[in-house]
Swiss-Prot record:
Residues 172-216 form a coiled coil. Residues 346-510 form the Integrase catalytic domain. InterPro entries: Homeodomain-like_sf, HTH-like_dom, Integrase_cat-core, RNaseH-like_sf, RNaseH_sf, Transpos_IS3, Transposase_8, Transposase_IS3/IS150/IS904. Keywords: Coiled coil, DNA integration, DNA recombination, Endonuclease, Hydrolase, Magnesium, Metal-binding, Nuclease, Plasmid. This is Probable transposase for insertion sequence element IS1353. It comes from the Bacteria. Mg(2+) binds at residues 357, 417. GO terms for molecular function: DNA binding; endonuclease activity; metal ion binding; transposase activity. Probably involved in the transposition of insertion sequence IS1353. IS1353 is an insertion seqeunce sometimes found in In2. PANTHER family: TRANSPOSASE INSF FOR INSERTION SEQUENCE IS3B-RELATED (PTHR46889), TRANSPOSASE INSO FOR INSERTION SEQUENCE ELEMENT IS911B-RELATED (PTHR46889:SF4). Gene3D superfamilies: Ribonuclease H-like superfamily/Ribonuclease H (3.30.420.10). One of its GO terms (biological process) is DNA transposition. It comes from Shigella flexneri.
Length: 514
């Protein structure tokens, strides 16, 4: 449900854009067309939108009330006939009007009783026990419980089966009453035990959700010993320790060992904070290997296994959902060139092998297209361009930026797929002027350009997929993508480069001045 501010923002933007429905939905990312039409109709009718739902209570005049009461008296004292004839009010309202205006005609329902209250199985058990152990009459027991005498005997029939009528004189040695009494007491004890067990299981789930931030659907047996110990400590005041340990399948010795460990100071407190900071500052996309490299670069040496354990305990998990790929293939405007790289994406020097491609990023506000050039030497994004249309200008401008970074004598191979952007005359003319050697993948074979596809995968799994892009405009998205690529070149750790970013690696090997 959209708030008042969201609905009013959508209507005002729609009017500001000249009542263009598609432009409004593309910029905001919400709502549906029918919802926006309904909001607009309400706004034009009231010059405002309702701030919430209000329950309207219908009001009747004194004349309407008197007319209904008179009709009831004149037409034979029938509530249904009066309501059908006049079309109002409800039966309860009409009865109230009769009591107020003509109380002498108000009818009292004979034999009415208090509303029926649902009784638990435990209450029924106790009532049946009292019935069988009574000294007085069954009516006295029924009055004490608050039910009728037939109801009491119905409970007995359901719980004990059909009980034969007792003879007026008790035979010697007849113990059926005592046996039923003992059976009822045993069943009552079992029900109380089962009730306590269910209460304990529910309390365990609630505490696991509260203390350990677990989902209510989690299986308590899948918790770690440390987490189980926290739950037991929180519930010891309410439930016996033995029952809690049994319910969580936790050995007594393990429980006291974990309690002892928790009293000791955590020697990884500082490391936990540093790991959490690194994870959050780097788009929540660092796994344990790059976290370990970042710690080493910061002068903090910790075992890789410790890093993995601490990340698991802090629940620092990289999310990697998948989306469909964008295809730029549009026929064969010019002949394709051969595949010169043949999936060899290793380069001994910068600016010898370049890769390029085009990808689509879709959010509620619309689509954005990213066109980069990746250097096979270290994965540096040499140049890139971001736009809202996958046209020739997007890729041609990107190529012009990349060519300006070349030094005299550098003429790399530029590899792409068979998309139409790389087969148009303007692209071919630019590559010939810069003396670049063109190379192309086979048709529909993404592994032939796997290194560039890998960059797109990292961009989407680290920046796009883990976040909610509702209410984000395309301009803001392009700004964030540009900032991500700068971070990718300057700060993002690559394990294959010794835990450095591409630019840091070039500084380290002397290929770029500081």
């Amino acid at each position: 449900m959209y708030s008042y501010e969201d609905r009013l923002r959508a209507v005002r933007l729609y009017l500001k854009l000249g009542r263009r429905m598609s432009a409004t939905l593309r910029q905001l990312g919400y709502p549906t067309k029918n919802s926006l039409k309904a909001w607009l109709a309400e706004f034009e009718r009231n010059q405002d939108l309702r701030r919430g739902y209000q329950r309207i209570k219908r009001q009747y005049t004194d004349e309407q009330k008197q007319r209904a009461v008179d009709h009831y008296i004149e037409q034979g004292y029938c509530l249904s006939h009066t309501i059908r004839s006049l079309g109002y009010p409800s039966r309860e309202a009409l009865r109230a009007w009769i009591r107020d205006l003509r109380p002498e005609f108000a009818r009292t329902v004979v034999g009415s009783s208090a509303p029926t209250v649902a009784r638990s199985r435990l209450e029924k058990q106790q009532a049946v026990i009292a019935l069988n152990l009574r000294v007085g009459s069954a009516k006295d027991v029924a009055d004490t419980v608050g039910v009728s005498r037939p109801t009491l005997y119905n409970w007995q029939h359901r719980l004990l089966g059909k009980v034969p009528l007792k003879p007026m004189t008790k035979k010697k040695g007849d113990t059926s009453l005592e046996q039923r009494h003992e059976a009822l007491l045993r069943e009552l004890a079992e029900l109380e035990s089962q009730n306590q067990r269910l209460r304990m299981e529910n309390a365990i789930l609630e505490k696991a959700s509260e203390l350990i931030k677990k989902d209510m659907g989690i299986n308590p047996l899948e918790l770690t010993s440390r987490e189980k110990t926290k739950v037991v400590d929180a519930l010891r005041v309410t439930f016996p320790l033995a029952n809690l340990l049994c319910g969580l399948k936790l050995a007594r010795s393990t429980y006291f060992y974990q309690r002892l460990r928790q009293t000791r100071p955590d020697k990884y407190t500082q490391v936990r904070e540093v790991i959490r900071t690194i994870f959050e500052d780097n788009y929540r996309c660092y796994g344990y290997r790059r976290i370990d490299s970042a710690l080493r670069l910061g002068g903090m040496r910790v075992s890789e296994k410790v890093v993995r354990r601490l990340m698991a305990q802090e629940r620092l998990v990289v999310r990697t959902p998948r989306r469909r790929r964008f295809s730029a293939y549009a026929g064969d405007p010019t002949p394709a060139v051969p595949n010169l790289l043949n999936r060899d994406f290793h380069a001994s020097a910068p600016n010898t092998k370049w890769l390029t491609d085009l990808t689509e990023i879709h959010i509620p506000a619309g689509k954005v297209y990213v066109s980069p050039i990746v250097d096979c030497f270290d994965g540096l994004v040499v140049a890139w361009n971001i736009g809202t249309s996958p046209d020739a200008n997007l890729v041609n401008t990107m190529l012009d930026h990349a060519v300006r970074t070349l030094r005299p004598g550098e003429h790399p191979v530029i590899h792409s797929d068979r998309g139409s952007h790389y087969r148009w005359p303007a692209w071919i003319r630019r590559t010939e002027n810069a003396q670049l050697t063109r190379s192309m993948s086979k048709k529909g074979c993404s592994p032939d350009n796997a290194a560039c596809e890998g960059f797109f995968g990292r961009l989407k799994t680290e920046l796009i997929y883990p976040r909610n892009w509702q209410h984000v405009t395309l301009k803001d998205l392009m700004t964030r993508i540009d900032a991500y690529i700068h971070w990718y070149n300057e700060r993002r750790i690559k394990v294959s480069l010794g835990g450095r970013s591409p630019i840091e690696y070039r500084h380290a090997v002397g290929l770029m001045s500081v």
